[in-house]
């Protein structure tokens, strides 16, 4: 059975897409720790990071770097967390490798944001997309 992320990649489920390449898709986390919390996901469905072919792992890292810069620019900070929960014992809830980019402007230390208000995800997505490659 396809993971929820594969279903998003295939267009079966909606997301607030930030970016997409041949190998990756990036979209907002629906239960963010902070506003702008973005997931970077390989299109190949593998449960663990080490299962990705090296070329795809390298591509994933390049996309993470590009999106992290955009998230920082969108939120006026330079600090962020990159998080990977690699396996169920590490807290991985979806068995499809994915990285979290969590902005931390001004040293923000807050509990999980919760959920976005109606229409807020589109605004947040537009804010980050406007900062890609700028």
Q: What function would you assign to each model-found segment?
A:
Residues 1-134:
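HIT superfamily nucleotide-processing domains
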